[in-house]
Curated annotation (Swiss-Prot):
Protein name, as recorded: HTH-type transcriptional regulator ImmR
UniProt keywords, alphabetically: DNA-binding, Transcription, Transcription regulation
Organism of provenance: Bacillus subtilis (strain 168)
Region (Disordered), start-end ranges: 1-22
One GO MF term attached to the UniProt entry: DNA binding
The gene coding this protein: immR
Amino acid sequence: MSLGKRLKEARQKAGYTQKEAAEKLNIGNNNLSNYERDYRDPDTDTLLKLSNLYNVSTDYLLGKDEVSKKNETDLLNKTINEAIQELKDEDTLLFMNDGEFDEETARLVKKALKNGIKFIDELKKKE
């Protein structure tokens, strides 16, 4: 599979339109389209940004690795950070003071995350 096809597939799996991905990457929609159609290859910095946005390895995009996922820690960190950002954007984290946690809140968030992950593990075992 070509780089362009892998880019398009990774973008679609990540749930982005070309326009949305281009905006997040701060590149023109035409540039992204050219990458996906194999008219041009992205430079190294852009390839890394694409990899991070789509949560795939650069090796996967370049066809050196058939596994599209980065390691589980990267995915977990990304998921947690996105969830916190979404909550901030929704003004849900009312317990934050100027965007910062106090020590007690940080401890409670950590405990909630650990319990949530344990719960997910138990659900997976039952499947």
